[in-house]
Amino acid sequence: MTNIRKSHPLMKIINDALVDLPAPSNISSWWNFGSLLGICLILQILTGLFLAMHYTPDTLTAFSSVTHICRDVNYGWAIRYMHANGASIFFICLFIHVGRGLYYGSYTFLETWNIGVILLLTTMATAFMGYVLPWGQMSFWGATVITNLLSAIPYIGTDLVEWIWGGFSVDKATLTRFFAFHFILPFIIMALAAVHLLFLHETGSNNPTGIPSNADKIPFHPYYTIKDILGVLLLMTMLLTLTLFAPDLLGDPDNYTPANPLSTPPHIKPEWYFLFAYAILRSIPNKLGGVLALVLSILILALIPMLHTSKQRSLMFRPLSQCLFWALIADLLTLTWIGGQPVEHPYIIIGQLASILYFLLILVLMPVAGIIENKLLKW
């Protein structure tokens, strides 16, 4: 008789994804982050669910309901800070996962890559709306500033902003709808992640060399299940260390002040994982131009497969492109730092140069490096 895990309709799906999946024998730890993202998502949904049981999406009580969770609910403080810092860990994993895809040329799996870009955008939207919910100063002003950017859209901009706000300013209607969206989106992310995985399993995983690995595949279990468990242990260690020793390390002190529409905080800035995009937005003096640059800074990922000029898939054997890749990482770190600084000299010019370099590296320098490397190989 066939093993139940291979014959049962539901077990078969899990078996083909986690047990008998043929995986390349040489994938490194950079391939761990997909499973870590899955763990992050489950963790965020669970902690979020328990938070939603005690949270009230109302301008008068939202702030105090979060305080109540931290003070009066059993282990509420742990759930709240695991959820807040879980988002940071989620984005660290996301950025590494995308970076891995860029470095090793995984973007040639078009469907998988494009769904990944949609997943990134959806996760960013979810995180933004979640940041508004505690209804502190940075929540309120962050929501005001970011939603206001839509008013730069010609003709329909102002109507669009008022439609999203549900009034003429960020108020009760805005908070209620943001809570509704923040609750539903993670489940949409889960469905998209399943499709992401479905398309990946159509082609099989890429590997560090970028060379087809059909000649040398190994079963996912036990080799990569045990490797993933190690990754999860390290991830949980990081998350718990952050939550228990420095829960407010990545947060903004302004968010411990209840939202006040009459007093603007000195420096409005988003959470650290949006700072790179925020720096690009601020580096352009024109409102519409800034919004376009902000959107393009993420959507440019969808163009990457079209900008691939090299005859090799991975950067493993391409030192010139490797240098440019690490320059891009350094540039993104610079943008992240600039996004958290006030708008004054010398930060303005540094931000503008870093923004230009970001687009220049992706759109011009890396494709040109690919062509040069092709020539060098022929020569």
From Swiss-Prot:
Its cofactor is heme b. It is a multi-pass membrane protein. Keywords: Electron transport, Heme, Iron, Membrane, Metal-binding, Mitochondrion, Mitochondrion inner membrane, Respiratory chain, Transmembrane, Transmembrane helix, Transport, Ubiquinone. CDD domains: cytochrome_b_C (cd00290), Cytochrome_b_N (cd00284). Component of the ubiquinol-cytochrome c reductase complex (complex III or cytochrome b-c1 complex) that is part of the mitochondrial respiratory chain. The b-c1 complex mediates electron transfer from ubiquinol to cytochrome c. Contributes to the generation of a proton gradient across the mitochondrial membrane that is then used for ATP synthesis. Belongs to the cytochrome b family. Heme 1 (or BL or b562) is low-potential and absorbs at about 562 nm, and heme 2 (or BH or b566) is high-potential and absorbs at about 566 nm. This is Cytochrome b.
